[in-house]
Amino acid sequence: MGKNTKAKKRAASLEVLASKSSPILEFVFDEPLIHVACHPEQPIVVCAIATGHVFCCKYDAKALKRILNKNEAKLAALENKDDQKRKRFWKLIKLKAEMDTYELEEGEETAAVELLWKTRRHKGSVRGMSFNNDGSKLYTIGIDNVLKKANSLTGKVMKKVTLPLSSEKNHYTKLVTSKTHPFLLLGDELGNIHVLNNDTLQLQNTIKSIHNGDAINDIFQFVGKSVYKFISLGQTTLAYWDSRESNESDASIPADDLDAKRKVYVSDDQEDEMICGSFVNPEDGDILVCGMGEGVLTVWKPKKNDLVDQVTRIPICKNESVDCVISSFQDDNCVYCGCSNGNVYKVNVKLGKVIEIRKHSSIDEVSFIDLDYEYRVLSAGMDKVKLWDIVDEDDDEEGKINESYSNSESDNDNGFDSDADSNSDSESVSSSDVDSASDDEENSKSESEANESDVEETLVGLSKDELLAELEKDLQSSDEDSKHYTKRTKSTQPKKLKKQKKELNNKQLRNLQKHEHGIRKFEGL
C-alpha cells in the first residue's frame, strides 16, 4: 500500500516537471556547432561551426507554429501509436557549409525560415560571437585571433583587427559585449581579460591571470555595481573586477595579506569547476547562480558575503555537468540551465528545485542556451539547435500543484538561505533526475540516461507524453536502487507526527484534582 502511494507521488511529480513546450524549429549540422546567438530585437539566430562558417537565419514563429499544428493533426490520425512517437512534427533544416540558399519544401508556399547570409568568417573554428545592444552589429573572434565586426543583416564586414597572443598555445575562449557602453571583453585560456573599444576595435586594458592562469569559462556584468564591473569564472573560482583598471599592482601584494585592497577579488576555492553563471534577476542583482562540473547550481548573494563563498547549492543532475545557464527574464526567480545529459532544466532558485524539464537530445549535451526576442528558449549542442515554442500560461494551476506538493514535504520556502533549507524545499522532486534532498541522494534519471542507446531515435526531441514515458522507466529502476537506503531515508526525513494523548492513571487524576504535581510540602523541614 505504501509503495503504491509513493509511486503515485512520483508520477505526479514527473507529470508536473515534464514541459508542455515542444520545438518549433530545429537546425542540424554536418560539422560541430561552436557557438549560437539570438538577435535581441528580431527573429534572427546566428550559428557558427568548426570550419569557420557562420549562418544567419530569419524565422517566422507564427508560420512555424502552423506547421507544427498541421503535422500534429496528421500524426493524431495515425492508428499506430509508435509511428506517432517516432515522427518529427516541427520544422527541420540542415545547414551545410556548401549551401547558399534554403529551398522550399513540397507544399510550402512561403518560407518559414530564410537564410539571410552565409560566409566563411574565419580561417578555422569560431571561438566567440556576440551581438551589440541593439543587434545591428555582430562581433566574432576566431582561432586565427582575428576579431571582426559585421552588419548583422547583411554579413558584410565593417572592421577587423588581428589580436595576437603572447603564446601560440593560447586562444580566446569568450567574447562579451557591453549592453550599455562602447566596449567588449575577450577572455583567453590563460585567464586574461582583454578590453577593447567596440567601434575602433583598439585594445584599452588588460587584466592578467585572474584565475591562477586557468581559462576564462564565462564573463557577465556585475549587476547592481558599476557598468564597468564584471564577474568571471575560471577553473574553481569566481572573481570580480573593474574593466577599466589593470591588476598589475596585485602582483606585489603578498598572498597572505588579506586586508590589502586588490583590483581583482577572488572567491574561495569551490573545489569544483565553475563553468557558467548568470544573475537570477538581471534588474536587481541580489542573487546569482553558477553551473558546476558536478551537476549543481551554486547560489551566491553579493550583499551577504561580497561573493567570498557560495550560500547554498541546488542539485540538478548527478554525475553530469551544468554547462550553460540564463535568466528566464520573467521576474519569477527562475533560470534555465543546460546539462551534459541533454536536458534543459527550469529551476526556481527561491524554492531551490527544478520545476520543468525539456529533452534536447539523448546523445548530445546542451552547451548553449539563449532566449530570442520574444523569450523563446533556444538550446544547442554540438550537432543541433532547437527553438522551443512559448507555452501560454493562462492559469497558474501547474505552479499551484508544484508548490503545494513541495509544501507537503517541506516546512520552509526559502531555498537559498541555508543548505538545510535548500534540501528540504527540493524534497518533492527527489523521485526525478533532480537530486534535491542531498548531494548523496540517488539520481535515477541520470543513471538511466547513461544507458540510453548510442543511436538517437528519429525523434530528436521528445514530446511531453514521450518524456513522461521515458521518465516513468526510471521509477522501476529507482525502486530497486532505493531499497538499500530506504531505512536511512526514513530515519533522516523529517515527518510531522501527531502526538497521541496518554490516558491518566488514578494517581495522576487524583493529583490533578487536588492541583498537586507529585511533590508535597513538608512543614518545618
Curated annotation (Swiss-Prot):
* Low complexity: compositionally biased ranges: 425-435
Keyword set for this entry? Nucleus, Repeat, WD repeat
The cross-references to InterPro entries, in alphabetical order and at most eight, read: WD40/YVTN_repeat-like_dom_sf (IPR015943), WD40_repeat_dom_sf (IPR036322), WD40_rpt (IPR001680)
Instruction: Say which domain of life the source belongs to.
Output: Eukaryota
Acidic residues biased stretches = 410-424
Question: In residue terms, where are the WD repeats?
Answer: 28-69, 121-160, 211-251, 270-310, 358-398
What cellular-component terms does GO give this entry?
nucleolus
Bias (Basic residues): 485-501
What SMART domains does the annotation carry?
WD40 (SM00320)
Q: What processes in GO biological process is this protein linked to?
A: positive regulation of transcription by RNA polymerase I; rRNA processing
Return the protein name. Answer: WD repeat-containing protein JIP5
Query: What organism is this sequence from?
Result: Kluyveromyces lactis (strain ATCC 8585 / CBS 2359 / DSM 70799 / NBRC 1267 / NRRL Y-1140 / WM37) (Yeast)
Its gene name is JIP5
